[in-house]
Swiss-Prot record:
The lineage of its organism: Eukaryota, Metazoa, Ecdysozoa, Arthropoda, Hexapoda. Beta-D-fructose binds at residues 70, 83, 182, 310, 337. This is Gustatory receptor for sugar taste 43a. The keyword Transport does not apply. Changing residue 360 to W: Reduces conduit ion current amplitude significantly. Changing residue 306 to A: Significantly reduces fructose-induced current. Changing residue 269 to A: No effect on fructose-induced current.
């Protein structure tokens, strides 16, 4: 996970949600040093175990009660159990990644600090900080409102189902630990999305630095070049020049139109620095995939199963009582789970797309640069880009990009048909 000046707010939110058991200290040079916090390590493990225990305790309470609120049929029991279990697995995997990925986190942030120093002229930490805080605030506010609406709806349904000597509202109370897990899950997704978005943002800034440093200047030089060549031709043809005058004209031409050897070397060093930064960003992508790959996998599975389960309960309600309040809440849950899926997929897709743009810019630079020193540096950068893979993956099982959305759409439709058929057969 990224722990930097722009994302420090998300880091503190993650600590409260048991996802970042680390401590940060600012050294004498002003840099943030990251280490393990044993207090928050114990806090993360304890909170996770307690919440998981209470969640399954509430699930069993509703399943074994005389009047179940959510588990009314055999199919609904299976769907609800899967719905709860996949959230639990996502939370456990996220906390596990936070507990055991300290080395990857240290390497990731060390690389990001060096990259930010290279791209210092294009950094805007203030805007990045507000974007990160805005993403976290909107996400947590949305899940708070949605959980409140859902609990209120189920409380109303439980009161309508209540009979003498039974307290169906207690069944809903036992689901509150499960709803609390959604806050941890949302914090985990905000953390991953912020890190992936930060990598994509740095890829984009590197591309802008490449374009402004090499393409803009070459375009200006090529626009001036014909005028200077024409001037030399007039001197040599219309008025016979003495050897000393001709030498002076050629010297002036070389000094004005061709970059000096020192300037070419400086540009070569700049290009090498940008190539190193691009390679380091690619390694940061792999570090994030390795450290949080299992969490991303369970998040994707949870999005898939939640979309299936929520749509299933929505169809059941449409075919039976048609409670308007319940229908609206289920539709809001579907929108939330879809946005939750996009929160993971879209930053990863944008980062990979910005990484692929770099090779297009380098190819354009290669066509316009003719100095031997620069041409060799551009060629090495181009060869490096041919083998760079900046795509995020979930434990190597699938690439996290927009193509996964079509697979999800077909899978949701298939599973919905199967569940509805089971419901009609078994009731």
């Amino acid at each position: 996970m990224e722990i930097s000046q722009p994302s420090i707010g998300i880091f503190y939110i993650s600590k409260v949600l048991a996802l970042a058991p680390y401590a940060t200290v600012r050294n004498s040079k002003g840099r943030v040093e990251i280490g393990r916090s044993w207090l928050f390590t114990v806090y993360s493990a304890t909170l996770t175990v307690v919440m998981v225990f209470l969640t399954y305790r509430g699930l069993l309470f509703d399943a074994n009660s005389e009047i179940p609120v959510r588990m009314k049929s055999a199919t609904s029991k299976v769907v609800t159990a899967l719905d709860v279990s996949v959230v639990v697995m996502a939370i456990v995997s996220g906390v596990y990644c936070g507990l055991f990925s300290l080395n990857d986190t240290l390497e990731l942030n060390d690389r990001l600090n060096k990259i930010d120093n290279t791209l210092n002229a294009y950094n805007n930490f203030r805007r990045d900080r507000w974007r990160a805080l805005g993403m976290a605030a909107v996400s947590l506010l949305a899940i708070s409102i949605l959980v409140g609406l859902d609990v209120g709806t189920w409380m109303r349904i439980a009161q309508d189902m209540n009979i003498a000597q039974s307290d169906t509202e207690l069944n809903v109370h036992w689901y509150i630990p499960f709803y609390s897990l959604y806050f941890i899950l949302t914090g985990l997704q905000v953390n991953i999305a912020n890190t992936a978005y930060g990598l994509g943002r740095r890829f984009g800034r590197l591309n802008r630095m490449l374009s402004s440093s090499f393409l803009a200047e070459n375009n200006a030089t090529s626009a001036i070049k014909p005028q200077k060549v024409s001037t030399v031709k007039n001197v040599s043809v219309n008025r016979p020049a003495m050897p000393s005058a001709l030498h002076a004209s050629l010297t002036k031409l070389n000094g004005e139109t061709l970059p000096s050897e020192a300037a070419a070397k400086n540009k070569g060093l700049l290009l090498k620095s940008l190539a190193d930064s691009h390679e380091s960003l690619g390694k940061c992508v792999h570090l994030l995939s390795n450290s949080f790959g299992i969490a991303v996998l369970f998040i994707l599975v949870s999005c898939l199963l939640h979309l299936v389960a929520t749509a299933y309960f929505l169809f059941l309600e449409l075919l039976s009582k048609r409670d308007n309040g319940y229908l609206w809440v289920q539709m809001l849950w579907i929108c939330f789970h879809f946005l939750r899926l996009l929160m993971v997929v879209e930053p990863c897709h944008l980062a990979a797309r910005e990484s692929r743009k770099t090779i297009q810019i380098v190819c354009e630079i290669e066509r316009k640069v003719h100095e031997p020193i620069l041409a060799e540096a551009v060629k090495k950068f181009w060869q490096q880009l041919l083998v760079v893979d900046a795509d995020f993956s979930a434990c190597g099982l699938c690439r996290v990009n927009r193509t996964i959305l079509t697979s999800f759409a077909s899978a949701i439709a298939t599973y919905l048909v199967i569940l509805i058929q089971f419901q009609r057969t078994n009731g």
